[in-house]
């Protein structure tokens, strides 16, 4: 079997009102104020993806660009959603941190394959406040805090053993420290919700797409 045939077998037909019981996405799902209604709908869809069995439904694929204008993507975990946008936390010295410093704009996609839905958010990127970072940091498991100190994210390393040695050294360093401080190179980013698009898979690839931009709402052709 050729590769194209193999991939063709993976095709999935999306649902309809009759098939999956979910009504067609429409602009009224955003409520009377789309500028904030998108937040409610995103939370709702995330919860429904979790109920359907999606692993880490807050996972989002974040795209940045490198110094040659080429797109780079990776999956991160969304840690807050409000009218201002969506946030995530990372090492500021990582590849994505360096790229955002040079070109502070990004897009994020929540891909909920189990329920045939996606949400796209894109806009300018800013660092969250030190207070917000400290608050989130304090809620992280101690092991995750140690990992953030141990890893020089995105830099090459000789082996797994070398990485674990760095973790051991950091663990010993903070052995008698009850509250591990936030690393100076670590914190959050907020992707502003300049544009938000909701996508719902439908039969025959005639999907539903609703876009919110600057408080304006429009339906897009699939």
Curated annotation (Swiss-Prot):
- Cofactor: record remark: Binds 1 FMN per subunit.
Q: Which positions does UniProt annotate for FMN binding? A: 74-79, 89-90, 96, 118, 153-154, 199, 209
Q: Which enzyme class?
A: oxidoreductase
Q: Which PROSITE patterns match?
A: PYRIDOX_OXIDASE (PS01064)
Q: Name one GO molecular function term.
A: FMN binding
InterPro entries xrefs: Pyridox_Oxase, Pyridox_Oxase_CS, Pyridox_Oxase_N, Pyridoxamine_oxidase_dimer_C, Split_barrel_FMN-bd
* UniProt-listed Enzyme Commission number(s): 1.4.3.5
Pathway it acts in?
Cofactor metabolism; pyridoxal 5'-phosphate salvage; pyridoxal 5'-phosphate from pyridoxamine 5'-phosphate: step 1/1; Cofactor metabolism; pyridoxal 5'-phosphate salvage; pyridoxal 5'-phosphate from pyridoxine 5'-phosphate: step 1/1
Alphabetized UniProt keyword annotations: Flavoprotein, FMN, Oxidoreductase, Pyridoxine biosynthesis
Among the GO biological process terms of this entry, one is: pyridoxine biosynthetic process
> Which residues take part in binding substrate?
11-14, 79, 136, 140, 144, 205-207
Q: What does this protein do?
A: Catalyzes the oxidation of either pyridoxine 5'-phosphate (PNP) or pyridoxamine 5'-phosphate (PMP) into pyridoxal 5'-phosphate (PLP).
State the family named in the UniProt similarity comment for this chain.
Belongs to the pyridoxamine 5'-phosphate oxidase family.
- From the Swiss-Prot or TrEMBL record, give the protein name: Pyridoxine/pyridoxamine 5'-phosphate oxidase
Q: Which gene encodes it?
A: pdxH
């Amino acid at each position: 079997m050729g590769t194209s045939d193999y991939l063709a077998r993976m095709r999935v037909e999306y649902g309809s009102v009759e098939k999956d019981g979910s009504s067609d996405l429409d602009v009224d799902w955003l409520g009377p104020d789309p500028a904030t209604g998108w937040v409610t709908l995103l939370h709702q869809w995330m919860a429904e993806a979790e109920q359907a069995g999606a692993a880490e439904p807050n996972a989002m694929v974040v795209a940045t660009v490198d110094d040659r204008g080429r797109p780079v993507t990776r999956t991160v975990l969304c840690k807050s959603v409000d009218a201002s946008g969506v946030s995530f936390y990372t090492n500021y010295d990582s590849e994505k941190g360096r790229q955002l410093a040079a070109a502070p704009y990004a897009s994020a996609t929540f891909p909920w394959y189990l329920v045939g839905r996606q949400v796209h958010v894109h806009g300018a990127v800013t660092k969250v406040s030190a207070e917000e970072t400290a608050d989130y940091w304090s809620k992280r498991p101690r092991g995750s805090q140690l990992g953030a100190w141990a890893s020089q994210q995105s830099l090459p390393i000789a082996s797994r053993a070398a990485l674990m040695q760095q973790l051991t050294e950091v663990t010993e360093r903070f052995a008698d420290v009850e509250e591990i401080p936030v690393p100076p190179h670590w914190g959050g980013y907020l992707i502003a919700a300049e544009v938000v698009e909701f996508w719902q898979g439908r039969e025959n690839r005639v999907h539903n797409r609703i876009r919110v931009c600057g408080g304006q709402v429009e339906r897009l052709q699939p």
